[in-house]
Design a protein with these regions (language model features):
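Hydrophobic beta-strand positions in extracellular immunoglobulin-like domains
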Residues: 61-65, 122-124, 140, 184-187, ...
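Low-complexity, intrinsically disordered segments enriched in Ser/Thr together with acidic residues
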Residues: 105-130, 231-274, 409-439
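Extracellular/luminal low-complexity Ser/Thr/Pro-rich, glycosylation-prone repeat/linker regions
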Residues: 34-39, 136-163, 264-326, 443-470
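Surface-exposed, proline-enriched loop/turn segments that connect beta strands in immunoglobulin-like
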Residues: 42-48, 88, 165-170, 214-215, ...
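Short beta-strand elements of extracellular/lumenal beta-sandwich folds
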Residues: 42-69, 168-194, 331-365
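Acidic, serine/threonine- and glycine-rich low-complexity intrinsically disordered segments
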Residues: 229-361, 366
Length: 470
């Protein structure tokens, strides 16, 4: 067996590193190892395998080491007797019911924090039936570290168990390009799946092709859902695919990274489509059809990175779509008499060709903008999606949507700010004096350094002027 890696790399690896870092904090990893001491831990999640006759499932045994001398994982398989067997890579040593594995050979020996995984293939024994369970004990030990001891449960289920093998990525694509995401799956359960339902979710910049056995519906954030029902049997151990995959086009509003997610499940027993989403068939198109894969099911099992229900998911990434991005700050004059109440209208418009979502904005919110209130103007009411900003010795921080502040932060109330869209808010204000400094609406937060970049910096800030009426 060889260790498996997810098909997505850049963004996927970043997410994995973040997740692992969070796990290490939960496990109690030291921020910095003490001189002369090491740290070594392992993690094997619980696994569900099919009953007797199922081909088995691969599960990663994760290892985390820091300054560890001679780190190794010792796995005790005694608790599996009568229920399941476990197969380890050739670089592990087996003695009776005990298996000892060093760090995986692909782990960088010079890394300050070493992270890797040991693939373990669990197979049901003859006579294993739904409801059976067993326990695997393991110890992470090193010559200069305290041992870490844990267990994992191996449960036996009775049914089909589809694993999605359809992930992938391309580095770059242009608007108008036609691409396809692979559709490939295997059944690691002990019963045949009679038909398969695949649910696709496309990001805002992707347009799906038309298929006669699929239903289409719009989702929030300008995304698209496509549900396809495919006939055909997927027997235990079989790997199936769709020739040509799932086609889609890079739309005119695509920008930076785009993605297509897919979820597979047995067609028998799949829930009815939610009526509130308004799924509809499209006219024309051909049918998506399953066929046996040219890759053997055994290899597919080894390459499966996870084998819990989460393995029904796969993602296809387009890392970069060159397109224009240009947000423009908007402001209208504050008009009224001294002592009178009026409004301060501020906002932002997407005048570029590409859609912007909350991930690609880099701010956790889509299209945040900042309002500096003109001198001689007092805010009396604050619109939704806006909060006051205050300056301290450590910088600026946001507070509640309180009146009376001199700075406010606002954001578009959506996960996607599409090309051509405009969002504006109205502050209730009172003009208290004349002749003060103008305010501003800016895409950059207060401070000496810019926080926003797009294709045209000249329209990222606009003045808020006060016009006095007699």
């Amino acid at each position: 067996m060889r260790s498996a890696r997810r098909p997505h790399a850049r963004a996927g690896r970043a997410a994995v590193v973040l997740a692992v870092t969070a796990s290490l904090v939960a496990l109690g990893a030291p921020a910095q190892a003490e001189t002369g001491s090491g740290w070594f831990q392992a993690q094997l999640d619980d696994v569900v395998i099919g009953a007797a006759g199922a081909p088995g499932k691969a599960k990663p045994l994760y290892v985390y080491a820091q300054d560890a001398v001679n780190p190794r994982v010792v796995v005790d398989l005694t608790g599996l007797l009568g229920v399941a067997s476990a197969e380890f890579p050739a670089w592990c040593a087996t003695s009776g019911t005990q298996v000892t594995c060093p760090l995986p050979p692909d782990v960088d020996p010079d890394s300050s924090l070493q992270i890797g995984s040991i693939p373990v293939l669990f197979r049901p024994l003859a006579g294993a039936s739904g409801g059976d369970s067993a326990t695997v004990s393991y110890r992470a030990v090193a010559d200069n570290a305290d041992p870490f001891v844990a267990t994992a449960t191996v449960s036996v289920g009775d049914g089909a168990d589809l694993v999605n093998l359809g992930g992938g990525r391309v580095d770059t694509a242009a608007v108008g390009d036609l691409l396809s995401a692979p559709i490939r799956l295997t059944n690691v359960g002990n019963r045949t799946s009679r038909g398969v339902r695949i649910t696709f979710t496309l990001s805002s910049g992707l347009t799906p092709s038309t298929w006669s056995n699929c239903w289409y519906a719009p989702l929030t954030g300008h995304r698209t859902s496509v549900v396809c029902d495919l006939n055909g049997r997927v027997r235990p151990g079989a790997t199936m695919e769709v020739s040509g995959g799932f086609g889609f086009e890079i739309g005119g509003s695509a920008y930076a990274g785009e993605s297509l997610d897919q979820f597979v499940e047995p067609l028998t027993g799949a829930a009815a489509l939610p009526t509130q989403l308004g799924y509809q068939r499209r006219e024309g198109g051909t049918k998506l059809r399953l066929r046996p894969s040219r890759t053997t099911s055994a290899a597919a099992r080894v390459l499966t990175p996870e084998i819990d229900p989460g393995d029904n998911w796969a993602s296809f990434y387009v890392d970069n779509v060159p397109n224009s991005l240009d947000l423009a700050a908007l402001a209208e004059p504050v008009v009224g008499p001294v002592g009178g109440s009026t409004i301060l209208r501020a906002g932002v418009r997407n005048i570029g060709a590409g859609d912007l979502d909350d991930f690609r904005s880099g701010a956790g919110e889509v299209a945040p903008f900042y309002v500096r209130v003109p001198s001689g103007v007092t805010v009396e009411s604050v619109p939704d999606r806006c909060v006051a900003l205050y300056e301290s010795e450590d910088g600026w921080y946001s507070g509640e949507p309180q009146p009376g502040a001199s700075w406010y932060r606002c954001a578009v109330p959506s996960s996607v700010f599409a090309a051509g869209e405009t969002y504006q808010v109205d502050f209730g204000v009172r003009i208290t004096s004349v002749g003060g400094a103008a305010g501003a609406v800016s895409l950059n937060m207060p401070g000496p350094y810019p926080s926003w970049w797009d294709d045209d910096r000249d329209n990222d800030e606009v003045a808020v002027v006060v016009q006095i009426q007699s």
